[in-house]
């Protein structure tokens, strides 16, 4: 199994069959209104104040219907700042704490520079400059990681 996250759009899981075809299961789709509603229902998931913020969670709902529950799949995407590693390092993990309800963790030093830009919902405001003053090398790495997300 492999997971693909297109940040701000969708999370998908795919299986490559023996014939080379891919079976794609959508684990969730991002919708700002659904994310804000999810934060209201789960206040402990709201971003901490900027001074103490080390991670944020985003809600991706309305995924493929789960065969076992009959409900749409959903995923919490946890973006976590980690330090002491190469700027280009990224760690990913996928958990399924409940049937067809997932947690996709994304941990990277790049996230550290994004956290101060986020609003009270943990989202990047439309007018925010995504890349604060960084060297050209850092900007390339950030863009590559954003493309992977």
Predicted regions and their residues:
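Long, low-complexity, largely intrinsically disordered segments
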Residues: 1-149
């Amino acid at each position: 199994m492999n997971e693909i996250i297109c940040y701000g759009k969708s999370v998908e899981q795919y299986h490559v069959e023996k014939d080379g075809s891919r079976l794609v299961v959508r684990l969730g789709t991002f919708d700002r209104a659904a994310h804000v509603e999810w934060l209201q229902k789960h206040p402990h998931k709201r971003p901490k104040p900027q001074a103490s913020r080390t991670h944020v969670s985003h809600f991706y709902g309305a995924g493929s219907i789960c065969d076992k529950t009959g409900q749409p799949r959903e995923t919490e995407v946890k973006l976590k700042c980690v330090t002491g590693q190469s700027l280009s390092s990224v760690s990913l993990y996928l958990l399924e704490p409940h049937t067809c309800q997932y947690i996709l963790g994304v941990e990277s030093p790049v996230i550290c520079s994004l956290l101060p830009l986020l609003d009270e919902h943990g989202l990047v405001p439309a007018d925010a400059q995504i890349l604060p003053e960084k060297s050209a090398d850092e900007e390339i790495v950030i863009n590559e990681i954003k493309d992977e997300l």
